[in-house]
């Protein structure tokens, strides 16, 4: 078992910011097209976060041209360049799947005050 834990520790990323469900994040992903490499930003609300060692994931949702788009990111993936936390959201749930059914202003999340 120690070998598995050692491999997992080598692949972990420790430069990720702290964010929770309800936070608006901007995820910069490396896209490789042929020999070229570029960064693509995906800005949206974190609706779910699954913790774990190397298999930790988080789901980000945004509405693009009236269509809801969700993307699941592996937190320790080398294809993620960096993550910016744009704003903190005030929510009472760990999973915000109910946002899928809401439209317009009802789908907004209040910003957390400090």
From Swiss-Prot:
Keyword Ribosomal protein applies: yes
Protein name: Large ribosomal subunit protein bL19
Short name of any one Pfam family annotated for the protein: Ribosomal_L19
Annotated family: Belongs to the bacterial ribosomal protein bL19 family.
Highest taxon in the source lineage: Bacteria
InterPro entries in the record: Ribosomal_bL19, Ribosomal_bL19_CS, Ribosomal_bL19_sf, Translation_prot_SH3-like_sf
Cellular component annotations (GO), alphabetically ordered: cytosolic large ribosomal subunit
Function comment: This protein is located at the 30S-50S ribosomal subunit interface and may play a role in the structure and function of the aminoacyl-tRNA binding site.
Disulfide bonds: none
One of the GO BP terms on file: translation
Keyword hit for Transcription: no
A GO term, aspect molecular function: structural constituent of ribosome
Encoding gene, per UniProt annotation: rplS
Keywords in alphabetical order: Ribonucleoprotein, Ribosomal protein
SUPFAM superfamilies in the cross-refs: Translation proteins SH3-like domain
């Amino acid at each position: 078992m120690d070998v598995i834990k050692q491999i997992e520790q080598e692949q972990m990323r420790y430069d990720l910011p702290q964010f929770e469900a309800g936070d608006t994040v901007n995820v910069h992903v490396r896209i490789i097209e042929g020999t070229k490499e570029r960064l693509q930003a995906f800005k949206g609300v974190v609706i779910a976060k699954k913790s774990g060692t190397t298999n930790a994931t988080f789901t980000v949702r945004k509405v693009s041209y009236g269509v809801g788009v969700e993307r699941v990111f592996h937190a320790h993936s080398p294809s993620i360049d960096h993550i910016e936390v744009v704003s903190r959201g005030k929510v009472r749930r760990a999973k915000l799947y109910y946002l899928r059914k809401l439209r317009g202003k009802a789908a907004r999340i209040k910003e957390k005050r400090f």
